[in-house]
Every structure is written in C-alpha cells, then in structure tokens.
Amino acid sequence: MELDEWFETYLESRYGCRDEAVEKAWDILRKTVYANEGNYESAITARPTFEKHNNWAYTDIPYDPVEVIKAWKYLLQAADRLGKNPCYRYDLILVGKQVLANYATIIQQKFGEDYRTKDLPAFTRNSREFMELIDDMDELMGTHEAFLLGK
C-alpha cells in the first residue's frame, strides 16, 4: 500500500469520515514533523538555556514551523464537521500545542539574543511573552482530559 493511500485510510478510520481539510493538514504534518528524525525539544520543556542546542537540549526546529501553523488551520476548518470526534479533538489540541511549542522556541531565541546584547526592555518583553505562552499552552492542554494531570 502506498503511503498516500495508507494515510487516507488511516484518517478515515480515525475520524469516521473523509475530510479534505484534515487530509491537507496531515499531508503537511507527514512532510514536516513526521519526516524528520532527531531529538528536537521544545524550549518550554528543555533545560533552560539561551542557546538553540547544548549538551542538555536541542531546540533547533528541523522543519518550517509555519507549515505546522498551516496544518493547524486546516484542522480547525473541520471543527464543525468533526468537533465531537474525540480523536479529532485530541489531534487538534496536540497540533496546537506543537504550534505554541515551536513559537516558544522562537521567542526563547529572541530573549537569548536580548540577554547577549543587554537589551533589557526587549528581554523583559520577550521573556514575559514566553511565560504567557506557557499559560496559553496550559489552557489549551486543559481542554482535553487526556492532557490533564491525574488522568
């Protein structure tokens, strides 16, 4: 079975129907997130650093993070049709979490550069945005019981 055909069959089985927007989203994901090997780690869960990678963390994103945003937007287009499907909701939240994690890595690099250049106003602004992003991610993850502590 060809990979394209396998994905179509898998998605129809997972969501209970075929959906063009969902298929576009997963096509993007398999060509970006799932096409890369390695140990990419979110700046949120990595050991604190101002660097993209060191002995403890590798936060250099191995794909274009804008593509994951596009995939999330495609998934969101299916909300009216698939919103009650638990697998769809799970995947929607997980891809959204990845979008936020990727953005956190970008912000982390900004405030790392702010620290190196001693730009206190920018460092304060970007580090605050990083902390707010953690709250946003926590709020998103809290919308599905599979991501709640104790479940």
Model-derived segments and spans:
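Substrate-binding groove of N-acetylhexosamine-processing glycoside hydrolases
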Residues: 1-151
